[in-house]
A protein has these predicted regions:
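Short hydrophobic "helix-edge" motifs at membrane interfaces and signal-peptide entry regions
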Residues: 10-11, 23
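SH3-family beta-barrel domains
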Residues: 21-39, 46-52, 57-117, 121-137, ...
Length: 149
């Protein structure tokens, strides 16, 4: 009986490993300022307006609507027409250092405070991401210091 139980465990773990890519997070950015609602209908209660450029995680997608999570964990509904494929991230650290290269000792390009929105340019090796500030400066940020990846 023990070999069968072991086989079942191995098969279960293998199934999880295969399914893991399906669980990838789907991040979007608001293309323009948009009202968000408590239900997928413009007739439902509007909660607040989210600023253009804000990254969100798309959790559920229905016809014309998406349920999204913001960087604080709030779940709201937004019309799909406001979502763009462009990727932005929000700084999670109190003060994040953006460097000229993807290494701790590289020259400091700029610092960004918590909740600053940065454009995501590309992933970099070693747990870094290349980002650009709205003023045009770009550099590398440690991935754990950003939300929206």
């Amino acid at each position: 009986m023990a070999p069968r139980r072991f086989s079942a465990v191995v098969l279960s773990l293998a199934a999880l490993a295969v399914a893991a890519p399906v669980l990838a997070l789907d991040y979007r950015t608001l293309a323009e300022a948009a009202p968000v609602y408590e239900a997928p209908s413009a007739k439902s209660k509007p909660l607040f307006v989210v600023l253009a450029g804000t990254p969100v995680e798309q959790v559920v997608s229905l016809e014309g609507w998406s349920k999204v999570r913001d960087n604080r964990g709030d779940l709201v509904w937004v019309e799909k027409k406001f979502l763009a494929e462009k990727r932005n991230v929000i700084v999670r650290a109190e003060r994040a250092q953006v460097r000229a290269a993807a290494e701790d000792k590289a020259a400091l390009v700029f610092e960004a405070e918590r909740d600053v929105v940065l454009e995501l340019l590309e992933a970099a090796p070693g747990g870094w991401v290349k980002v650009r500030h709205r003023d045009g400066q770009s550099g590398f940020l440690k991935a754990p210091q950003a939300w929206g990846l």
